[in-house]
Amino acid sequence: MDFSRVIFEDDYKSIRDSAKNFASEIVAPRAKQIDEDDKFFFDIIKKAGEMGILGIELPQNEGGAGADAISSVITTEEIASFSPVVASTIGAMRTHIMLLNKFGTQDQKKELLPRLVNGEGIAALGITEPNAGSDLSCLETTAKRKRDVFILNGSKTYTSFGNICDFIFVLAYTNKDLGTRNGMTLFIVKTGTKGLKVGPEEQKLGLRGMPLVSLTFDNLELEKENILGEEGNGFPQLMNCFDATRTDVAAQAIGISKSCLKICREYSSVRTQFNRPLIDFQAIQWMLVDMDVEIAAGRLLMHQAAHLRSQKSRCSREASRAKLFCSDNAMKHATNAIQILGGYGYLKSSPIEMLFRDAKVLQIYDGTNQIQRIILAREISKDEIK
C-alpha cells in the first residue's frame, strides 16, 4: 500500500480538514455536556447526515458521499478525539446503513435508507442476549414460521438506540437445526409493533449520551417482507460487517489516544515540580514517547485494514489486529494520562476523566479483545507468516 497517498493526497487532506472542522465546531462545544446530561444528540447526528458523514461510503447514486474506507476512518479518528460517544454513534449508524444497503431489498432500501443517511432516521441492532454474547450459537430468540408469518419471541440486551429508533435489526433463529451459519435470520422490526417491549435505559460507565436498553419480543408477528434480504443469512450478513466495524473501533481508539497525548504534552509543559516542568523528567518523556509511537503504529494498522476494505479484499486479520492493538493502547494511554496529570486527572473536571471511561468499552464491543486474539491465533495457524 502507498501510505503517502493517505497522508498527502488532497482528497484525504480535504476530508480530514472537513471532519476536524465538524468535530471542533459542532461536537467539541457539546462533548462535556452530552457526557454530563446523558442525553442523545439528535441535532449533531442530523448535521452529520447533512455533511455526508453518515453515508460516507455509500455510493453517490444511493445518496451517499461515495468515499472509501480510508475516508471513513479518518473522519472517525477526528471526531473521536473530541467526543468518543459521537464517533461511536456515527460508527454504529454507518453499520446500519451498510447492512441495509448491502443486504436489503429494493423496497426496504427505498423506504428506510434515505432517512438513515440524512440523519433523520435512527436504527438499532439487536444481537446480544443475556446468555449469548461472544458465543452467538447460544442465541435464544426465535422466529418460528406460522403459515405466512414469523412469530418472534425472546429478548435482547445492551441494544444501543433501542428506545429512540425507528426500527431494529433483530437476529433470531429461524431454524436451529441448520446451526449458526445458516439457521439465523435478520429481521427488520419497526418501533411500535405489537409484542415489542422496550426496557428502561441502562446507566453506563462511559459513552454517556448513547442510550442502551433491553428488548423483549412476545409473540411479535413479522411478514416475510420484514426479513433483511433472505432467510438464513443473518449470521453471514453480520460477519460481513465486522471488518468495517473493527477498523472503525481502531479509529475511535486512535482518536482517544491522540487526545491523551495532546492533553499530557500541554499539561506537562506548564506544570512544574522540583523547579522543572514535568516534561523535563525522563519518566514523563518516556510515557509520552510510548503514546506517540503506539499511535503512529496503530494508525498504520488501521489504514492497512481500511485500504484492503476499499479494495474489496478480505481483511479480517488486519481489522482484528488494528482493533486489538489500538483499543488496548487507548486504555493504556488514558490510564497513563491520569498518572501524568496526577490528582487533577482523577477529578471529574479533568479532560482525561471522560476519555478514560469511554476507552474501556473499545476492548469489549465488536468482539472482545480476547476474541480478537482467538481470531488472530487461527489466522496465524493456517496462513503463511510473511
Identify the role of each PLM range.
Residues 153-198:
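A short core secondary-structure module
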Residues 89, 116, 131-134, 158-161, ...:
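Short Gly/Pro-enriched turn/cap motifs at secondary-structure boundaries
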Residues 138, 192-223:
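Flexible, small-/acidic-enriched active-site or ligand-binding loops
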Residues 52, 76-80, 172-173, 189-194, ...:
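Short Ser/Thr-interspersed hydrophobic loop/turn segments at strand-loop and sheet-helix junctions
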Residues 94-103:
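Helix-loop "lid/cap" segments that line or gate small-molecule binding pockets
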Residues 218-237:
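Long, acidic (Asp/Glu-rich), low-complexity accessory segments flanking structured domains
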Residues 119-127, 171:
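A short, Trp-centered hydrophobic/proline-enriched beta-strand micro-motif
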Residues 1-82, 86, 103-108, 115-120, ...:
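Alpha-helical interface subdomain recognition
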